[in-house]
């Protein structure tokens, strides 16, 4: 692991340690409610033990604003074809170069507002940094880097159903992604491959459905949120549709802190069409038939919420995990581990 990745990992661990200390401090002043069923939505948010990055959980009281920041780190190392590991030499039998490893960092800024108790509006804008290493047939190694804004998203979350005590809720998500991320990134005068571009280049529909369950000590739920690409982009291709299904459970450690576990399953298709500036025989990352796949991630997280005091409305979270299953239309780089750090403030 290079120094850059070590620095990222140390930062995540340091944040997690600080989070645990903060949770302990917050719990010392917290008081246990005596009648859970009498609590309103704002009080339920103080009890909420759901992971910060589950989109459908962001339902807020009428008139409330929330701003958020999330840092996401994805590490990829080695190639898979189906579920089998493929060495560089085998990749180089078919292509001029082989990707060896890649990192992706995403800084996501989110703004939310709830005009009514049943409706939350949300806007999201990512800033993405990518780095990919390669090896050529003659043993030459090289690196490619790119960074910039990704595709902006807007969402509307609407409560379709809720029990009187709010222990069971069904949330509908209507989302749209706009092509603000570049699909024309180049390096050394050559167009970068598909995974190194920053956006889809198309308007994408992002519907979703979320179930939330919660009692005094636990929370659970499931979410389905596909992404449908509309038409081809300006470079005459479109990314494959994505289908994501998540299930989670969480248990309170203190009145203000929780431990969560999440299973995240995702499937995505190959690219339709092709960018004429990319030679598919050059490397698999330029081959439209080597872009799809399926993956199941197992994530564990710590979450904290401050319902009162000087940090009232502040929510902190750290989550990390790794794939437990991958099958890729390869050869394609496999994901080895992921980490998420989030900060949100409601007012």
Name the predicted role of every residue range.
Residues 30-91, 165, 171:
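Outer-membrane beta-barrel biogenesis signature
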Residues 49-56, 115-117, 157-165, 170, ...:
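Outer-membrane beta-barrel proteins
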Residues 54, 92-97, 137-144, 192-197, ...:
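Extracellular loop and loop/strand-boundary signature of outer-membrane beta-barrel proteins
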Residues 55-64, 76-80, 101, 118, ...:
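Short loop/turn motifs that connect adjacent beta-strands in outer-membrane beta-barrel proteins
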Residues 57, 69, 109-113, 123, ...:
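Residues on the lipid-exposed face of transmembrane beta-strands in outer-membrane beta-barrel proteins
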Residues 63, 103-107, 146-152, 168, ...:
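Residues that define the transmembrane beta-barrel architecture of outer-membrane proteins
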Residues 67-73, 123-127, 172-178, 222-228, ...:
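Transmembrane beta-barrel strands of outer-membrane/channel proteins
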Residues 80, 84-90, 236-347:
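Outer membrane beta-barrel transmembrane domains
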């Amino acid at each position: 692991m290079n120094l850059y990745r070590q620095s990222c990992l140390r930062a995540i661990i340091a944040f997690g340690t600080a989070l645990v200390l903060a949770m302990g401090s917050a719990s010392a002043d917290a008081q246990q409610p005596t009648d859970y069923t009498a609590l309103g939505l704002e009080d339920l948010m103080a009890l909420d033990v759901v992971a910060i990055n589950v989109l459908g959980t962001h339902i807020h009281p009428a008139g409330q604003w929330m701003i958020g920041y999330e840092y996401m780190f994805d590490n990829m190392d080695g190639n898979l074809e189906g579920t089998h590991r493929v060495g560089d030499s085998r990749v180089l039998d078919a292509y001029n170069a082989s990707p060896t490893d890649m990192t992706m960092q995403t800084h996501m800024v989110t703004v939310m507002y709830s005009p009514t108790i049943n409706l939350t509006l949300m806007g999201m804008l990512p800033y993405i940094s990518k780095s990919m290493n390669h090896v050529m047939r003659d043993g030459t190694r090289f690196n490619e880097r790119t960074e910039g804004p990704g595709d902006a998203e807007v969402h509307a979350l609407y409560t379709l159903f809720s029990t009187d005590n709010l222990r069971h809720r069904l949330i509908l998500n209507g989302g749209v992604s706009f092509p603000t991320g570049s699909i024309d990134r180049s390096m050394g005068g050559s167009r970068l491959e598909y995974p190194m571009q920053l956006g889809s280049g198309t308007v994408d529909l992002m519907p979703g459905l979320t179930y939330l369950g919660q009692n005094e000590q636990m929370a659970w739920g499931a979410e389905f949120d596909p992404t449908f690409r509309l038409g081809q982009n300006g470079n005459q291709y479109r990314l494959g549709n994505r289908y994501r299904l998540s299930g989670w459970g969480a248990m309170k450690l203190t009145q203000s802190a929780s431990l969560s576990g999440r299973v995240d399953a995702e499937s995505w298709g190959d690219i339709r069409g092709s960018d004429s500036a990319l030679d598919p025989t050059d490397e698999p990352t330029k081959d439209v038939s080597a872009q799809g796949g399926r993956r199941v991630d197992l994530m564990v997280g710590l979450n904290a919420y401050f319902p009162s005091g000087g940090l009232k409305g502040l929510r902190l979270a750290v989550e990390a995990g790794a794939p437990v299953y991958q099958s890729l239309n390869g050869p394609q780089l496999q994901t080895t581990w992921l980490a998420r750090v989030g900060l949100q403030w409601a007012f």
